[in-house]
């Protein structure tokens, strides 16, 4: 960074106005470089001249940043940040202003060992309403607490996977996320995953720094680690409330709940209780004695006993409803979680549920839902140009995975520079390592795609991506990666051919046919086997042969297809060396979207 010097001039000229750069009380080196429109290396050099050693993610305070800004010839100004929750009212919110307030819906997320469950138990034990005798005892996946006369609804999801599964199906169930981080362990990879999912949901985040009772607790380290990934607490000039807690000693619980109420007040959460009920399925199961049972979060309207409801591909009449403490109730207002009985079959988590006027209307809606193919809201490189042209999207969300950490920054910077006035490139998550199931779920939830550079993909992740039609691109050359994205934004990228696995089967026995051909006696494990498909035979994880199937039989009868759970005989063209435990993958190729 070159420090500006003044030069004498023969003429008296009016000096141009000095550019003012506004910053919060704390800023990372990269953010400061972006504000100065310079390379982060130049900022690091400027800091070194002041005796400060820093890396690109280092967070520095305003006074230090001010010195760098002024040395570059600009003026620094401290920006007073407003809470992210205090958003401008949209037309929809203005219409809601006449309706009553509803309880906030909160999800607690974080690393599995950071005390998330114990924190939930502490909240529940000190604030939950007393259970009634004679109700149900099933855990319904949500509960309400009351503090200072105000209710708060907590979704007790097993992890951010369930949270994201709901969003992937178009259901936004949460108003506020509490991110739990242990004060002794600090930020862990699962913490960052949870943070990515919370950010993608676009809801306010409250930081609970838990395990403050531990001797090695270091809350400042937690704040520093989170600041490096863009989550800055209020006391450092950010907009995130940070609450120290100890679930073990029951400390900080009320302060945490008060923080939730503060955010809820700023969000001005309202709903119309008088319209037909609508909500989302947050848990569902087949109860052995009661039949299909669904836990529903009512989001608007009032769900009543006897209502006819539709949820995805099933419907029913509400025969019984139980609240979170097992009490039978006759109605449920907005933000109330209830377990209901009366569905024809078990709905899926994330299904939207709505009350309708008649049974005929319910059946018609189910038929319509069943006939339409469920698709995710994800885009692909092939169709992104059309999506932008049609006004469907204004942002391209990308999950970026590379082989090593050093490859991330140059690829991220190059991709972000491809943003135009019509579409913005967002890197929702970046990291080193294989593409995981969590990456695919984030792509599902954000309507995005995945780009891998010199890295692989986990088997479960590939299966989920195939099932949900998520575009995963693999590259070994950075130039080709950037070129493809650039072409995609201009509508110039040619469609790619991808493999779609239709079904998998395991060889359980081997038979010799009359024509001296080997037939594999198989059990179909998943999907379906289709006659004349291309088949890949795997043995110990290695591909032994890739050949078309020329025989598919059940009980000596030729069949066109065999679905999961059934046995069959399979023959492959010019192949007779089947062995027990071989895996057969039936697949076809198609152009990507």
Curated annotation (Swiss-Prot):
Keywords: Cytoplasm, GTP-binding, Initiation factor, Nucleotide-binding, Protein biosynthesis. One of its GO terms (molecular function) is translation initiation factor activity. Residues 101-270 form the tr-type G domain. Gene3D superfamilies: P-loop containing nucleotide triphosphate hydrolases (3.40.50.300), Translation factors (2.40.30.10), Translation initiation factor IF- 2, domain 3 (3.40.50.10050). InterPro entries: EF-G-like_DII, IF2_II, IF2_N, P-loop_NTPase, Small_GTP-bd, T_Tr_GTP-bd_dom, TF_IF2_bacterial-like, TIF_IF2. GO terms for cellular component: cytosol. It is found in: Cytoplasm. GTP binds at residues 110-117, 156-160, 210-213. Residues 210-213 are annotated as: G4. Signal peptide: none annotated. Residues 110-117 are annotated as: G1. It comes from the Bacteria. Disulfide bonds: none annotated. Residues 135-139 are annotated as: G2. The keyword Transcription does not apply. Pfam families: EF-G_D2, GTP_EFTU, IF-2, IF2_N. SUPFAM superfamilies: Initiation factor IF2/eIF5b, domain 3, P-loop containing nucleoside triphosphate hydrolases, Translation proteins. PANTHER family: TR-TYPE G DOMAIN-CONTAINING PROTEIN (PTHR43381:SF5), TRANSLATION INITIATION FACTOR IF-2-RELATED (PTHR43381). One of the essential components for the initiation of protein synthesis. Protects formylmethionyl-tRNA from spontaneous hydrolysis and promotes its binding to the 30S ribosomal subunits. Also involved in the hydrolysis of GTP during the formation of the 70S ribosomal complex. This is Translation initiation factor IF-2. It comes from Dehalococcoides mccartyi (strain ATCC BAA-2100 / JCM 16839 / KCTC 5957 / BAV1). The lineage of its organism: Bacteria, Bacillati, Chloroflexota, Dehalococcoidia, Dehalococcoidales. The gene is infB.
């Amino acid at each position: 960074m070159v420090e500006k010097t003044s030069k004498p001039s023969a003429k008296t000229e009016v000096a141009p106005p000095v550019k003012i750069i506004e910053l919060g009380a704390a800023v990372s080196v990269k953010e400061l470089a972006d504000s100065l429109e310079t390379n982060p290396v130049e900022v690091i050099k400027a800091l070194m001249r002041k005796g400060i050693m820093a890396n690109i993610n280092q967070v520095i305070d305003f006074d230090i940043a001010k010195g760098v800004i002024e040395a570059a010839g600009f003026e620094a100004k401290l920006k007073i940040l407003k809470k992210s929750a205090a958003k401008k009212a949209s037309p929809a919110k203005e219409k809601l202003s006449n309706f009553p307030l509803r309880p906030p819906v909160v999800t607690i997320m974080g690393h599995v060992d950071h005390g998330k469950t114990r924190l939930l138990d502490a909240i529940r034990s000190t604030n939950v309403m007393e259970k009634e005798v004679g109700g149900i005892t099933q855990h319904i996946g949500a509960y309400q607490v009351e503090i200072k006369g105000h209710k708060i609804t907590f979704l007790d999801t097993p992890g951010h996977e369930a949270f994201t599964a709901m969003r992937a199906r178009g259901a936004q169930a949460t108003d506020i996320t509490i991110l739990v981080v242990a004060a002794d362990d600090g930020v862990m990879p699962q913490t960052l995953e949870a943070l990515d999912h919370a950010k993608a949901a676009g809801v306010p985040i409250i930081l609970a720094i838990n395990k403050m009772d531990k001797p090695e607790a270091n809350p400042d380290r937690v704040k520093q680690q989170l600041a490096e990934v863009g989550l800055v607490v209020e006391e450092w000039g950010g907009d995130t409330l940070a609450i120290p807690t100890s679930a073990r000693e029951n400390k900080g619980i009320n302060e945490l709940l008060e923080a939730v109420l503060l955010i809820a007040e700023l969000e001005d959460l309202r709903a119309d209780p008088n319209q037909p009920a609508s909500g989302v399925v947050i848990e569902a199961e087949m109860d052995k004695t009661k039949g299909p049972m669904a836990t529903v979060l009512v989001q608007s309207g009032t769900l009543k006993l006897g209502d006819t409801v539709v949820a995805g591909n099933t419907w029913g009449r509400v025969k019984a409803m139980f609240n979170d403490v097992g009490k039978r109730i006759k109605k449920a207002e907005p933000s109330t979680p209830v377990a209901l009985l009366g569905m024809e079959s078990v709905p899926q988590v994330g299904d939207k549920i709505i009350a309708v006027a008649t049974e005929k209307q319910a059946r018609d809606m189910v038929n319509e839902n069943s006939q339409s193919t469920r698709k995710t809201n994800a885009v692909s490189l092939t169709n992104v140009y059309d999506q932008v042209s049609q006004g469907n999207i204004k942002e391209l969300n990308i999950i970026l995975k590379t082989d090593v950490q050093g490859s991330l920054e140059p690829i991220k910077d190059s991709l972000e520079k491809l943003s135009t006035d019509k579409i913005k490139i967002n890197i929702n998550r970046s990291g080193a390592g294989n593409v995981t199931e969590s990456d695919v779920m984030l792509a599902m939830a954000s309507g995005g795609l995945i780009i891998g550079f010199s890295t692989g993909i986990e088997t479960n992740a590939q299966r989920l991506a195939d099932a949900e039609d998520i575009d995963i691109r693999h590259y070994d050359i950075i130039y080709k990666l950037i070129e493809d994205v650039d072409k995609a934004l201009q509508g110039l990228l040619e469609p790619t051919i991808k493999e779609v696995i239709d079904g998998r089967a395991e060889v359980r026995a081997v038979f010799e046919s009359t024509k001296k051909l080997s037939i594999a006696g198989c059990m179909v494990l998943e999907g379906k086997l289709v006659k004349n498909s291309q088949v890949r035979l795997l043995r110990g994880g290695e591909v032994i042969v890739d050949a078309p199937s020329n025989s598919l039989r059940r009980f000596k009868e030729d069949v066109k297809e065999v679905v999961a759970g059934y046995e069959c005989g399979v023959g492959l063209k010019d192949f007779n060396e089947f062995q027990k435990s071989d895996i057969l993958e039936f697949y076809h190729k198609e152009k990507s979207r």
